[in-house]
Amino acid sequence: KVAVNYLKSENSANDVVREITSAGGTAKSFKADISKVPDIEQLTKEVLHEWGNVDILVNNAGVFRTVPVMETTEEIWDEQLTLNLRSCFFFVKTLVPHWQEIGGGKVINISSIAGTGAFPNCPAYCASKGGLVNLTRALAAELGKENINVNSIAPGNVATALNAHVRGPGNEEYIALMKTLTPTGIDFLDVEDMTGTAVFLASDDSRMIHGETIVVDAGWSVW
């Protein structure tokens, strides 16, 4: 059973629901603004009311903006830190009492290689994703004794709606550059390239892995 959260992208959320149900699973979409703690708490209540249990939380909501230091406003900074980092913490905090009752749970945070390294022209994004890497470690250190398993994935350059603006016509030079940055010569990874790692972290096979960030970037970070 999968609860799919959305705020504005209802059609995309419903597409995910249909994909899951067509494969024989159970899924439902839930609208909530997870930049607001009351919405996180209400969403959690709705999912628990619907299905009675939450075993795994995937913190995958996020925002990415290419903005250099001198153009980063307070609003841009707060937007990225709130959605990419703050919401992840309060989602976990909201679910901890439930996991204590049922004997454990799992958290998979979606960070970025911008959190394990750094890039120019996106200081707020790097700060938010770097914070998520260390939040993963801090949560694991505190919650491991509760049988709450917390890890994260740091994707490389994955083709998503967040970076569609740099993958279209007119960006040939950028795309060519991306191919030189990995030993594999891959410019953009597919979303499906993340699924194996996510399924592993969601499974019991990862029960002895706590506080780790697994990089999936086609080899970008080896250079």
Q: Where are the regions a protein language model picked out?
A:
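Substrate-binding pocket helix/loop in short-chain dehydrogenase/reductase
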Residues: 68-69, 76-81, 178
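Active-site loop immediately N-terminal to the catalytic Tyr-X3-Lys motif
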Residues: 70, 117-123, 145-146, 204
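Short, small/polar-rich loop/turn modules that mediate ligand/substrate recognition or access, typified
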Residues: 144, 149, 209-211
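Active-site helix of classical SDR
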Residues: 92, 128, 136
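Residue(s) in the substrate-gating loop at a strand-loop-helix junction
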Residues: 112
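Catalytic Tyr-x(3-8)-Lys segment
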Residues: 171-193
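Short C-terminal tail/terminal secondary-structure segment
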Residues: 117, 181, 199, 210-223
